[in-house]
Structures are given as structure tokens and as C-alpha cells.
Amino acid sequence: WEKIKSLKVAYITEKLSLDSKEAQEFWPIYNEYEEKRHELMRKEHTQIKDKLENSDDLSEKEAKKLLTLKIAIEEDEEELDKAFLIEVSKVTSAKKALLLLKAEEDFKRDLIKQYRHNKGGK
């Protein structure tokens, strides 16, 4: 996991052409965002997805409660994303905030491609 994280840091730094001042301000914001994002994913997993494993036993009342929770988590994610992009654009630029979105998608795609290539080669 640490290797992937360090590859991602290098990839994003290169794609955004962050200078040392920008990087010094950007990475703490990014790391905090990633942690909050993971917290929301863990919350969704533990409070919703685990319960869906036994969906045959799920009552309509419980399902409504889980659906409400799912919507609330998605709203929290959306607010987190908006606040993050605004903050990133302040310490870098609006253009770099947009480039970040592309860089993250490209990194994921490249990582999956690499995984499939290595898996197929074994």
C-alpha cells in the first residue's frame, strides 16, 4: 500500500507540475482529504454493505434506514469533494485543481492496467 501511495504522490506531483511551495501547501490538504474520504468509505462499508450481505433478513424499515444513511454519506462525500477542490484551487490554481481530477483518474486507470498486465503475465 505504501508503494502505491508513493507512486501516486510522484505521479500527481509530476502531472500538476507542483513547485516546492505549492507541494508544501498541497500535500497536507490532499492527505487530510484522502483520510476523510477513506473514513466515509469505511463508514459505508461497515454500516451498509456488511448488512446487505444478509439482505434476505433485511426488513423494509431497516432498508429505509440504510438508504437514508447511504444518501447522507453520499452528500457528505459531495461536500468534502467541493471543499477540497476549492481549497486546492486556493493553494495552487483552478487549472491545477482540474488537472488533479484527471491525474487521479489516469493514475487509477494506469494502476489497473499494470495490475492486469502483471496478473496475465504470471
Map each language-model feature to its residues.
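Amphipathic, charged alpha-helical segments and their helix-to-coil junctions
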Residues: 6-7, 15, 74-122
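General structural signal for secondary-structure boundaries
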Residues: 1, 59-60, 117
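Acidic, low-complexity proline/glycine-rich segments
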Residues: 1-9
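Amphipathic alpha-helical segments
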Residues: 8-91
